[in-house]
Amino acid sequence: MSRIGRLPITVPAGVEVKVDGSVVSVKGSKGELSHTVASPIEVSLEDGTLTVARPNDERASRSLHGLTRTLIANMIQGVTAGYEKKLEIVGTGYRVQAKGSDLEFALGYSHPVNVSAPNGITFAVETPTKLSVSGISKQQVGEVAANIRKLRKPDPYKGKGIRYAGEVIRRKVGKAGK
């Protein structure tokens, strides 16, 4: 049995979980999320504890077992505490500023780059070179942060670009001069 999948999920106080057939809905103080469980996997709720079970030991069932348990646990974490990714901008003249709920980046291009916040995502600009992406869906927060990072990936020679906070960029040595 999956080591992750067999662990029960404890539902904390203030979180409401509904299992309706193959749809699991989680509602908490920060919002509401739902997930459709893949067909061979079964989710049951008893006495404030969620258990994820699989009917057989086929390879597909085994892989979905741990995945489903982790996705539901991430939903519960999201509606209680939420998720946040911090990004840093490194480079001369590279900066970000908030324009309402959107962001405007100056990244060395001939034009400013605008990023609008999707539903459920909030941006916070701490300094012109630091920003954070937060929301209740771990997947959505990670995807939006990755899309922002993709606007100007860190350069391996000078280290300029957008990076996650604490990310170490592997630097390359430039060509040898005469």
UniProtKB/Swiss-Prot annotation:
Q: Which UniProt keywords apply?
A: Ribonucleoprotein, Ribosomal protein, RNA-binding, rRNA-binding
Q: Which GO terms describe its cellular component?
A: cytosolic large ribosomal subunit
Recorded hits in Pfam families, A to Z, give: Ribosomal_L6
Keyword hit for Flavoprotein? no
What Gene Ontology biological process does one annotation of this record name?
A: cytoplasmic translation
Any one GO molecular-function label of the UniProt entry? structural constituent of ribosome
Which Gene3D superfamilies does this UniProt record tie to the protein?
A: Ribosomal protein L6, alpha-beta domain (3.90.930.12)
Q: Which family does it belong to?
A: Belongs to the universal ribosomal protein uL6 family.
Q: How does it assemble?
A: Part of the 50S ribosomal subunit.
Cross-referenced PANTHER family: 60S/50S RIBOSOMAL PROTEIN L6/L9 (PTHR11655), LARGE RIBOSOMAL SUBUNIT PROTEIN UL6M (PTHR11655:SF14)
Q: State what this protein does.
A: This protein binds to the 23S rRNA, and is important in its secondary structure. It is located near the subunit interface in the base of the L7/L12 stalk, and near the tRNA binding site of the peptidyltransferase center.
Q: Which HAMAP family match?
A: Ribosomal_uL6_B
Q: What is this protein called?
A: Large ribosomal subunit protein uL6
Please tell me the species this chain comes from. Arthrobacter sp. (strain FB24)
